[in-house]
Amino acid sequence: MKTRTEKDTFGPIEVPEQHLWGAQTQRSLHFFAISTEKMPVPLVAAMARLKRAAAKVNAELGELDPQVADAIMRAADEVIAGKWPDEFPLSVWQTGSGTQSNMNMNEVLANRASELLGGERGEGRKVHPNDHVNRGQSSNDTFPTAMHVAAAVEVEHRVLPALKALRGTLAAKSAAFYDIVKIGRTHLQDATPLTLGQEISGYVAQLDLAEQQIRATLAGLHQLAIGGTAVGTGLNAHPQFSAKVSAELAHDTGSAFVSAPNKFQALASHEALLFAHGALKTLAAGLMKIANDVRWLASGPRSGLGEISIPENEPGSSIMPGKVNPTQCEAVTMLAAQVMGNDVAINVGGASGNFELNVFKPLVIHNFLQSVRLLADGMVSFDKHCAAGIEPNRERITELVERSLMLVTALNPHIGYDKAAQIAKKAHKENLSLKEAALALGHLTEAQFAEWVVPGDMTNARR
């Protein structure tokens, strides 16, 4: 393997010739060969967007030669476009400030910008990773800025559209099934009737609440740490740098980014990400509930509830011929569990900052972005391959309604709770219908039973 010599303050080190990274990235590869988790692609893109904005603003403020700034911006555009995916190989499990990943970006952009200016990589390059690409910045403010940019963009462009689409599918099902009377269930036991549409409307409302909660967290994610530099004082950054870079990122992404009002907090803690992930966890809890309900309602086909049918997507067993399983529901419940686990890790990371810097940043953003991707992809998959194909099994629904003892609840206002309970117990013990038990006990007439026990009427009682 051909190499070239790169240098940092620790001295020279050999770097693979074909790669754009430099000395600090190479040292990180050596000292942090830990597991397989790499810095998330959305974070890399966010860091490139930040470096592009910083170069542009530094040039406007007279802090950077315009030609150098232009080359850095062009190099950053290539990274944003996904041209150099193999140049960002560092593990999540590195320094807690993300310094190595900040320098990875600085080195790649410096070497590539040098090439764009007709120069070379390495010692003779025309663009310096620290003096030019990182000008007016510290890893301590760039990394948390990239965290917020990546988190906000991914939530806005992945999670919310997927949530909206699934919500629309379920709302359409709720409207289509609104007149189908079915038996309700509480404590996994029979309860009074409702309609299938009413039941699904509860799922729609859960998703509406989740969307409201997620949107409420975006204002915090839009506040950026850039300009705080090392400890929040803004040392070595132009006084206008923070506001201008934030405005440039807002223009670039379409998100409402602004300079954080207190840079000390922005470097030392991550409440905005904890708050936002809490909303994602709430969405995960709702999705787990919905998916569990769907697979219970579709259980069978002959020995379960069987009130609905869901798409049959693939064989379900390697030994039982013809078996089909609710696999989309299972995938959603698993990913929801992972998001809940991620929330614990993010909470620990967010609570573990000391003095002027939180040093769990890679952990926090790795888990956050994994949750975003899981939820977004999971909702798209569940919507397309399960929810869109939900259909009612009307005969089975009617059968279960007619067999339910809890229809007796409609008699409470007419004969009282105690007599109604006697009817239900007699029917259950002697395997009678409610009507047969009621007439045998003499608590009401056949005409009264027909008038008072109407499942459809019970779904709209006292509304």
UniProtKB/Swiss-Prot annotation:
Alphabetical keyword list: Cytoplasm, Lyase, Tricarboxylic acid cycle
Cellular compartment(s): Cytoplasm
Binding residues for substrate: 97-99, 125, 128-131, 138-140, 186, 318, 323-325
Compositional bias annotation for Basic and acidic residues: 121-134
Pfam families in UniProt: FumaraseC_C (PF10415), Lyase_1 (PF00206)
Catalysed reaction equations from the record: (S)-malate = fumarate + H2O
Residue positions of the active site: H187, S317
Site (Important for catalytic activity): residue numbering on this chain: E330
CC per GO annotation: cytoplasm
CDD domains: Fumarase_classII
The enzyme's E.C. designation: 4.2.1.2
Region (Disordered): 121-142
Pathway in which this enzyme or protein is active: Carbohydrate metabolism; tricarboxylic acid cycle; (S)-malate from fumarate: step 1/1
Any GO MF annotation of the entry: fumarate hydratase activity
Broad class of enzyme this protein falls into: lyase
GO aspect biological process, one term: fumarate metabolic process
Note: There are 2 substrate-binding sites: the catalytic A site, and the non-catalytic B site that may play a role in the transfer of substrate or product between the active site and the solvent. Alternatively, the B site may bind allosteric effectors.
HAMAP family: FumaraseC
Family: Belongs to the class-II fumarase/aspartase family. Fumarase subfamily.
Complex formation: Homotetramer.
Full protein name: Fumarate hydratase class II
UniProt source species: Bordetella pertussis (strain Tohama I / ATCC BAA-589 / NCTC 13251)
Name of the coding gene: fumC
